């Protein structure tokens, strides 16, 4: 049976990951939060560990078919959820996932892997920009996202929302030193590094013959 828990109090400690979502730092946190029926459904169907789901009492009947028996489901009224998260919330459903173990750059070129089709973002500081890049990368069939040490968090609420949950299936690699790591990537046998620039003199994308292993380098804000 579905593990639906009608809570007596919005102060229940199990709701900790959902509290004050706007007022706290998400970077490197143990858990991440997703908003809305669509993204919660994608999270539940992914290979990531789902800690819990928080549902408005007006939405529980609608989303019940999405919810597996193995995941605790907390049900509260809208005003109680808004008090917990710290802002007006109309989507009615939130999910809490466990952040996957961060992949090191050295794992990127390991043995037994598929051909590398990656995008590298040395210093993307805007969550919506990174989310757009991730969504596009997933649509194009890329299989790796390389982030510089100063890049924003791929598991922030805003990034996940804009990416439409691309982080659930796109492996994310965090560099310790992006310049030296990308130099190592360039030096790896057969790897092609392509830099994307807004320049009318640049070689058009249609003129590039990609290698089996390649990485597109993006600089933006």
Residues covered by each model-derived region:
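Boundary-proximal intrinsically disordered activation/regulatory segments immediately upstream
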Residues: 1-57
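RNA substrate-binding interface of SAM-dependent RNA methyltransferases
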Residues: 38, 45, 105-203
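A contiguous loop/helix-start segment that scaffolds small-molecule binding in enzyme catalytic cores
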Residues: 206-215
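Glycine/small-residue-rich loop that forms an oxyanion/phosphate-binding "nest" at active or ligand-binding sites
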Residues: 75-88
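Short, charged/polar "capping" segments at the starts of alpha-helices
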Residues: 58-64, 154-155
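Glycine-rich phosphate-binding loops that contact phosphosugars or nucleotide phosphates
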Residues: 95
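Conserved small/polar residues in nucleotide/adenosyl-binding loops
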Residues: 219-220
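Short acidic-hydrophobic, aromatic-tinged amphipathic segments that line or gate anion-handling sites
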Residues: 6-7, 74-76, 171-178
């Amino acid at each position: 049976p579905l593990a639906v828990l009608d809570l007596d109090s919005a102060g229940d400690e199990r709701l900790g990951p959902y509290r004050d979502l706007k007022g706290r730092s998400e970077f490197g946190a143990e858990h991440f939060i997703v908003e809305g029926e669509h993204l919660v459904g994608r999270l539940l169907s992914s290979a990531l560990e789902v800690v819990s789901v928080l549902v408005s009492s007006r939405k529980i009947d609608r989303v019940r078919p999405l919810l597996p028996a193995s995941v605790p489901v907390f049900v509260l009224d809208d005003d109680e959820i808004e008090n917990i998260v710290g802002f007006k919330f109309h989507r009615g459903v939130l999910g809490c996932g466990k952040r996957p173990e961060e992949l090191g750059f050295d794992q990127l070129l390991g043995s037994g892997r598929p051909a590398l089709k990656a995008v590298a973002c040395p210093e993307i500081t805007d969550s919506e920009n990174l989310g757009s890049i991730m969504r596009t990368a997933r649509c194009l069939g890329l299989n790796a996202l390389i982030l510089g040490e100063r890049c924003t968090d791929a598991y922030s609420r805003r990034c996940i929302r804009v990416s439409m949950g691309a982080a659930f299936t796109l492996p994310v690699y965090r560099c310790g030193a992006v310049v030296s790591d990308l130099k190592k990537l360039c030096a790896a046998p057969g790897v092609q590094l392509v830099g994307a620039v807004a320049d009318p003199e640049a070689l058009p994308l249609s003129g590039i013959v990609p290698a089996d292993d390649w990485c597109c380098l993006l600089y933006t804000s």
